[in-house]
């Protein structure tokens, strides 16, 4: 599945495939994809939501759907791209893709719903206005 969608995703993170990520069949085990997607989520939040305090806030995944289109081999050069496709009051929906850097082939796609959580108050909270605006500006959400 090859798509020209690069320009729709501003946040792109190259991924390193580790020795233990590859099974005896020579491909990356599908459980590892979730770790790759987490790397993209972490970079996205740190890049877009300036001043995000990981000791004060958490972001919980409340729903996740992953589609697998093609195997990732141990020698592949891959990256994950991330964008917000919907911004609610206390939650947001991310779309992510793992793709081959050389061919642009999309290997997997992930849709997830995440909730902002205040660790001190022990409850979900609304996004601060500055982060809400930063996400809108970064991903072109109206």
Residue positions per predicted region:
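HotDog/MaoC-like acyl-thioester-processing domains
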Residues: 2-13, 68, 73-74, 85-142
């Amino acid at each position: 599945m090859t798509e020209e969608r690069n320009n729709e995703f501003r946040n792109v993170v190259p991924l390193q495939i580790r020795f233990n990520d590859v099974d005896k069949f020579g491909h990356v085990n599908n459980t590892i994809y979730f770790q790759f997607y987490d790397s993209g989520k972490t970079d996205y939040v740190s890049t877009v939501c300036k001043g995000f305090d990981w000791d004060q806030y958490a972001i919980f995944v409340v729903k996740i759907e992953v589609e697998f289109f093609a195997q990732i081999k141990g020698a592949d050069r891959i990256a994950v791209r991330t964008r917000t496709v919907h911004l609610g009051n206390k939650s947001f929906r991310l779309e992510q893709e793992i793709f081959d850097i050389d061919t642009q082939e999309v290997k997997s796609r992930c849709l997830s719903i995440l909730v902002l959580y205040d660790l001190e108050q022990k409850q979900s909270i609304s996004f601060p206005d500055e982060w809400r605006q930063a996400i809108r500006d970064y991903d072109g959400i109206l």
